[in-house]
From Swiss-Prot:
Signal peptide: none annotated. Keywords: Electron transport, Heme, Iron, Membrane, Metal-binding, Oxidoreductase, Transmembrane, Transmembrane helix, Transport. It is an enzyme of class 1 (oxidoreductase). Residues 1-9, 70-82, 143-151, 216-234 are cytoplasmic. One of its GO terms (molecular function) is metal ion binding. This is Probable ascorbate-specific transmembrane electron transporter 1.
């Protein structure tokens, strides 16, 4: 399935938005929220690691893994496949550490865990992400299924991957909303600089995710690599 447009312009837009989103979340957590720390008497610094790792390490790196076939269309397929696999693995590790930091913050601050939709979706999404990675490793890398099996499961692998990716984006949006709501209920100015920064960061993430999805389902060139197409056509 193609959209009649090439992927390249959307990968450029996605990369620009990724830089913007990463910069904005760092400004938020370091300038407005006081910095980052794995160990601190100020427990909020521990929490600050969570949005940074989840956005930059989990969503942005995961997005790069999704777009690698479009960003490097002339590279050997086995090379881009390995990059795809490694980037997803790194994103998964960063996501796990980011979730650990949220639990650590809650536990050390006496806050209950897993009570919100954001937390439920977060755990569910990273579990699905892990399952998707394991399936992709076994089917396409090692021990690697037969060509006919790979051809049959590839569309499902792509569709499920995009589903998990969109779910991760939705979870991030809920996270921004939840944290900003908590801050505003504690006295943060609803129309202040920090509130606007968080809201605009969330909007940038939506646009970024949309660019990644469009790039993923658009052809990189006239002829896609033999074994990989965004959504293989019948």
């Amino acid at each position: 399935m193609g959209l009649g447009v090439r992927a390249a312009p959307f990968t450029y837009v996605a990369h620009a938005l990724a830089v913007a989103a990463a910069t904005m979340v760092l400004v938020w957590c370091i300038h407005f929220r006081g910095g980052l720390a794995f160990e601190a008497t100020n427990k909020n610094l521990i929490f600050n690691v969570h949005p940074v790792l989840m956005l930059i390490g989990y969503i942005i790196l995961g997005s790069e893994a999704i777009m690698v076939y479009k960003v490097l269309p002339t590279w050997k397929h086995d090379t881009t496949k390995l990059i795809h696999l490694i980037l997803h693995a790194i994103a998964l590790v960063f996501g796990a550490v980011g979730i650990y930091c949220a639990f650590k913050f809650h536990n050390e601050s006496g806050i209950a865990n897993l009570y919100s939709l954001h937390s439920w979706l977060g755990i569910g999404t990273i579990c699905l992400y892990g399952i998707q990675w394991i399936f992709g490793f076994v089917a396409f890398f090692f021990p690697r299924a037969s060509p006919s099996v790979r051809k049959g499961v590839l569309p499902w692998h792509i569709l499920f991957g995009l589903f998990v990716y969109i779910l991760a984006l939705a979870t991030a949006e809920l996270g921004f909303l939840e944290k900003l709501t908590f801050l505003q209920s504690s006295g943060l100015d609803k129309y202040g600089a920090e509130a606007f920064l968080v809201n605009f960061t969330a909007l940038i993430v939506v646009l970024f995710g949309a660019s990644v999805v469009v790039a993923a389902v658009s052809p990189a060139r006239v002829e896609e690599p033999h074994e990989y197409a965004p959504i293989p056509e019948s």
